[in-house]
Amino acid sequence: MSLVRRSNVFDPFSLDLWDPFDSVFRSVVPATSDNDTAAFANARIDWKETPESHVFKADLPGVKKEEVKVEVEEGNVLVISGQRSKEKEDKNDKWHRVERSSGQFMRRFRLPENAKVDQVKAGLENGVLTVTVPKAEVKKPEVKAIEISG
């Protein structure tokens, strides 16, 4: 059983409830407020360690590979950043609901000493970014048998 919390399903404040005043406030506050980008700006990234590597995965649906950057800075800090552009709006369009997020995101991860930062690989497939950072092999101590005389 995993102790890692994967979602906010049990958070009563994250539920999508009907609000009778929602339409009143939507007419005053435009649908493209800063809250619309909050979910994307705080992109969630999984980091798992295998015996051979550190693997980072991020769900980035609708993001093109040209809109994502993966870098290593300061020697051991992995930086994953990107941007999802807003959909072009027509002045005649009337939005009923805006749930897909847009905007920029940036996440930084300090890599452990065993990370081979010169061999980092990244791929974007089916909306999932996977960054693999190989680990340095742990050197086994050399044991030399000493012959006992006598």
Curated annotation (Swiss-Prot):
GO BP annotations listed: protein complex oligomerization; protein folding; response to heat; response to hydrogen peroxide; response to salt stress
Residue segments, region Important for thermostability under elevated temperature: 1-42
Residue spans crossing the bilayer: none
GO CC annotation terms, alphabetical: cytoplasm
Main location: cytoplasm
Superkingdom, taxonomy of origin: Eukaryota
InterPro entries: A-crystallin/Hsp20_dom, HSP20-like_chaperone, Small_HSP
Domain annotation sHSP: ranges: 36-150
Localization, UniProt: Cytoplasm
Induction: By heat shock.
SUPFAM superfamilies for this protein: HSP20-like chaperones
Keyword annotations: Cytoplasm, Stress response
GO terms of molecular function: unfolded protein binding
Family named by the database record: Belongs to the small heat shock protein (HSP20) family.
Quaternary structure and interacting proteins, as annotated: Forms oligomeric structures.
Protein name (database record): 16.9 kDa class I heat shock protein 1
Organism listed in the record: Oryza sativa subsp. japonica
Lineage summary: Eukaryota, Viridiplantae, Streptophyta, Embryophyta, Tracheophyta
